[in-house]
From Swiss-Prot:
The chain crosses the membrane at residues 8-28, 66-86, 105-125, 178-198, 203-223, 505-525. Catalyzes the phospholipid dependent N-acylation of the N-terminal cysteine of apolipoprotein, the last step in lipoprotein maturation. Keywords: Acyltransferase, Cell inner membrane, Cell membrane, Membrane, Transferase, Transmembrane, Transmembrane helix. The lineage of its organism: Bacteria, Pseudomonadati, Pseudomonadota, Alphaproteobacteria, Hyphomicrobiales. The keyword Cell membrane applies. Its EC number is 2.3.1.269. This is Apolipoprotein N-acyltransferase. PROSITE patterns: CN_HYDROLASE. PANTHER family: APOLIPOPROTEIN N-ACYLTRANSFERASE. The gene is lnt. Gene3D superfamilies: Carbon-nitrogen hydrolase. GO terms for biological process: lipoprotein biosynthetic process. It comes from the Bacteria. Belongs to the CN hydrolase family. Apolipoprotein N-acyltransferase subfamily. It comes from Agrobacterium fabrum (strain C58 / ATCC 33970). GO terms for molecular function: N-acyltransferase activity.
Length: 529
């Protein structure tokens, strides 16, 4: 291992960039649909050795060392995000004649921007670099902060945070309930980078022992927590999720709107399976209603005739808000609650819009510079200022998250407290049967664990599921299947944690790692001088 580490450290020029890109790309194997978490041991071990070789030019000063480290981190991130997000380009192929020009932006441009976070993380860690365990702690702390920044800067896009790589199955998800995603990400980097100590020997014993203990605790806590079955309340609701698997190209045709609506009604009216209760609530996916529902009373009447007495439909739909004479209306990506009388008894709008999918960031600036191609990308939705929990006549509430809102742990506001479930409606049909829907589904499962609240996930093409507060699938429909699932909704876990608690733990872990990193770095700097 020492010889291999030495060869990596001494590699120069283009070979270093290629190795960093390859290390990041291999790390994406830890993500769905593969879930091979051990790949990240290779990735971060190689990354540490590459940074070990960032010595800078003699007399070149601080930046001569930081810039090569930034480059290695950027290349690592570029490989990771290209391998993990290439499927985004599939959405542009649905209207290839109009948007094929944007494929390089989706497949290479977005990863190039996201890689900046990892570039800055490695550059920051390099400021505290040493020749032992301290550098592993510095790298973990820096990656934790970079993922925190990625979750909110420029609207935020925390998709495929490193922490998801160490949570492929429920037994490995439970630590997220105790610590939260950011803490898991930080500790995961420490664990995955620790084998690099074998190549340099210094700090190897304590480092590997600590990493081993953390990994054992990760599995052990998961095993312990999964011994508790999810409780089913006496007044538990039965949920039906409708998965019509409407091809996205068909949803975009005006001619098929009536047939699409009829398909949702048909699936909703199917009798429950043998031994199943009649559903109390029915869930349709994001933007299931292919027209403005409030302008179509006949559609509401058809919904009323389909629902049995006491049933409530939650459906994704586009909501239009009239702005008055001379002003264009606003459109919102919404969820309606509709009772068996065809009355809309609740509604909520999407708060966190998808950039370039539901709106174009900096549209005014782009228009001033004459960049019309980007402005022509799909969009046109307005963002709500807050989300409204949906309440049944019985008083039970559901916390709505539309599409990728569920990937943001910070979206879990106090309105989640006391909710019967998180209601997540989405349409992953844009991306086809690629890794995208599977990655999205994993993040929904982790939110259930993190919050201790079950998740009802209705997806047009899948994966639809009812998920218990431990991330286990009570019932599900695979990607691409047409059908329904009926399931009894479990209760939440009794040991709920809040996002504020998780955030406190993250900064505590960050502080401990910084202490571990700073003292060896000071000693290392003195020896070098």
């Amino acid at each position: 291992m020492e010889r291999l580490a030495g060869r990596v450290m001494l590699a120069g020029g283009m070979s270093r960039a290629v190795m960093a890109i390859a290390a990041g790309a291999v790390g994406a194997l830890a993500l769905p649909p593969f879930g091979f978490f051990a790949a990240l041991f290779f990735s971060f071990t190689l990354l540490v050795w590459l940074v070990d070789g960032c010595t800078g030019k003699p007399g070149g000063g601080l930046f001569s060392r930081i810039l090569p480290a930034f480059g290695i981190g950027w290349c690592f991130g570029f490989g990771y995000f290209v391998a993990g997000l290439w499927w985004l380009g599939n959405a542009l192929l649905l209207e290839a004649d109009e948007f094929a020009w944007a494929l390089p932006l989706a497949i290479l441009g977005l990863p190039a921007l996201l890689a900046l976070f990892y570039g800055f993380a490695v550059a920051a860690a390099n400021l505290l670099w040493s020749d032992g365990l301290g550098r592993i702690a510095a790298l973990a702390a820096a990656f934790g902060v970079s993922e925190w920044l990625r979750s909110f800067l420029a609207t935020g896009f925390p998709w495929n945070a490193i922490g998801y790589g160490i949570m492929p199955i429920p037994i490995m998800m439970q630590s997220a309930h105790l610590l939260g995603l950011l803490s898991i990400t930080t500790l995961a980097v420490f664990i995955f980078a620790s084998p690099a100590l074998i190549g340099t020997k210094k700090g190897m014993g304590p480092g590997l022992a600590l990493a081993g203990l953390l990994l054992a605790a990760h599995f052990g806590y998961g095993f312990y927590r999964l011994q508790t079955p999810a409780e089913t309340p006496a007044d538990a609701l039965t949920v039906r999720i409708v998965q019509p698997a409407i091809d996205q190209s068909r949803k975009m045709l005006n001619t098929d709107r009536a047939e699409i609506f009829a398909e949702h009604l048909r699936l909703s009216a199917l009798p429950p399976g043998e031994g199943k209760k009649r559903p109390d609530i029915i869930v349709w996916p994001e933007t299931s209603v292919p027209f403005i529902l409030t302008q179509n009373p006949d559609a509401l009447a058809e919904i009323a005739s389909t629902l049995e007495d006491g049933q409530v439909l939650f459906t994704g739909a586009v909501r239009m808000e009239d702005q008055g004479a001379g002003r264009p209306p606003r459109y919102y990506n919404s969820v309606y609650a509709i009772d068996s009388q065809g009355e809309i008894i609740g509604a909520t709008d999407k708060v966190h819009l998808t950039p370039f999918g539901e709106y174009v960031p900096f549209e005014g600036i782009l228009r001033e510079f004459g960049i019309d191609n980007v402005i022509a990308l799909p969009g046109g939705f307005s963002a709500a200022s807050s989300r409204t929990p949906l309440t049944l006549p019985s008083g039970k509430t559901f916390y709505p998250l539309i599409c990728y809102e569920i990937i943001f742990p910070g979206e879990m506001t106090p309105g989640l407290q006391g909710a019967a479930a998180i209601l997540n409606v989405t349409n992953d049909g844009w991306f086809g049967d690629t890794p995208g829907p599977y990655q999205h589904f994993l993040q929904a499962r982790v939110r259930a664990v993190e919050t201790g609240v079950p998740v009802i996930r209705g997806a047009n093409t899948g994966i639809s599921a009812v998920i218990d507060p431990y991330g286990r699938i009570i019932a599900g429909l695979d990607y691409g299947r047409v059908g329904i699932l009926d399931a009894t909704l479990s209760g939440g876990s009794n040991d709920a944690f809040t996002y504020d608690t998780h955030r406190t733990y993250f900064w505590l872990i960050f502080s401990i790692l910084m202490i571990v990193a700073v003292f060896p770095a000071l000693s290392f700097a003195r020896r070098q001088n």
